[in-house]
Amino acid sequence: MEGEERKGEAGPGPGRLSALQEQLIWALLGSGLSREVLVHALGELERERVTPGAEKGDRGDGESSEEGEMDFPPPIFQELEALAPEEAARQRALVDQLLQEDPWRVAKLVKSYMQQHNLPQREVVESIGLNQSHLSQHLNKGTPMKNQKRAALYSWYVRKQGEISQQFTNARHALGSGEEQGEDVRKGRRNRFKWGPASQQILFHAYERQRNPSKEEREGLVEECNRAECLQRGVSPSQLAGLGSNLVTEVRVYNWFANRRKEEAFRHKLALDMPYNSQSASSTNHTLSHSPEQGMKYSQQITCDNLGSSRGHNGDRGLGGRLASPIQLEPSHTLLETHHHKPVSGGGPLPPVSTLTSLHSLSASPAPHHGLIMTSLPSVMSLGESSLLIGQTVPVINNVGGGFTTLQPISFQQQLHSTSQQQLTQQFQSHMGHHHSPFMATMAQLPCHMYSKSDMSHYPPSSLLSQAMVITDSSSLGTLTSLTTVRQILTTDPEEQTDQPIQEDSLHLQSPSPVPVSSGNLQLYPPSQSSESHPPHRLSSSPADINSYIPAQMVSTAQ
């Protein structure tokens, strides 16, 4: 109790204890603690707050750093112990002084010194054993660092200052023992040469003037760069040897210019390749978007497949050598062909009408279109007094009332003489001329191909079956059906016109009467002929009546 009274009497010196503090003291004394034990415990707490408290606070500041990284002393501390006692004491005093200052201000000071002397962070990492990422964050952003790590960093900074100052001080007589000592010091951690900002500015200005300087010009640049490096470090240019590994040489200047020329050539190549890459990419996208159309092929059904055999059976020498059989033609012709572009000459065959199929809905279209008839008529050929036998299919595309559209080949023969040729041409052009549609007016401007007998030798046999596409409305089909249906016979000599007529039973539709046609099911080939040719195409049912669209001349034969 006597100690309690003394404690209470000693308390009101600077100020009286609060009621809570008095309760705490009475509780401690009441727990069995004596006055001596309590005073000793207070002294221990005060000592821990002064010395170990700083280390404890340093742990709190270094929470972002790697734990357990500095369990062993850094290598820089071992090197510091190897120095002379006076030098070691001096460096420890400088390190303690830096530890008392603001860490962020000291970090900026160390970073500025490293940039001034072109010192890489790798050298710091190898000297103090610190993580380079943590060191970079501390120097650039002021990331908190433990006192032990900061002490290692500041120890390296202080020692490096002394080494560099000694290099420039002893630069004049460093050719002797000093150079060997420097080699021994840098043997384990040789720094890589790094261009300083002052030297780079000089070299870039020189590169703008001359991209490939001569050796004399490079030597002049070496002197300018070394002078700038010395001034950057705050030393006299006479202390040039103090630059050490950062000394600029003629070989390094030559390599710098060579690297810049390579970089410029590479950038120029990239600039040239950029438009080509963009163009190829756009063309690739365009090709991919149109790839379904490239694979579409439109075939033409050829029904006159026995033409060559009938010619050989009847022994017609002239026709065998001059007339081309439809079998010689390719059975499939492409209207949209991208891989093989065949030039279309004046006497070459026009591409046949393609097999176009389109399914339209009557309810979707507000007004049904007129039925369109697309036919492929034989070309009009003038061969003097002789005539040409044309026996081929005429594909007809019929679109009735917006219904199903399909291709229907019709086989018929015509004999066109000089008078009938002119009539056919006049009728066709007059019909197209009176049509008011712009598209039909454009089609009317297409000329009918006229050939003479002398020009036929310049064309392949397939040109004898050239076609002319006719597109007309179903309402004007009467003009088309009024064309004269005749037959032409080609002979090699006008005197052979009186020979025995050629039997062409296999080329004609042997039906005494026109084939019955109905709007429900349109069949343009009788079953007797479809067995030896391609299967017939049938038009689907359509609500409109197309009986008036199919003339008898197009399905009958002219005997």
Curated annotation (Swiss-Prot):
Main location: nucleus
Family statement drawn from the similarity comment of this UniProt entry: Belongs to the HNF1 homeobox family.
Positions of the UniProt region annotated as Interaction with DNA: 121-123, 134-140, 146-149, 192-195, 252-254, 259-262
Any Gene Ontology biological process: liver development
Organism (species): Salmo salar (Atlantic salmon)
Domain HNF-p1 span(s) in chain numbering: 13-44
Membrane spanning residue stretches: none
Region (Dimerization): 14-43
Protein's UniProt name: Hepatocyte nuclear factor 1-alpha
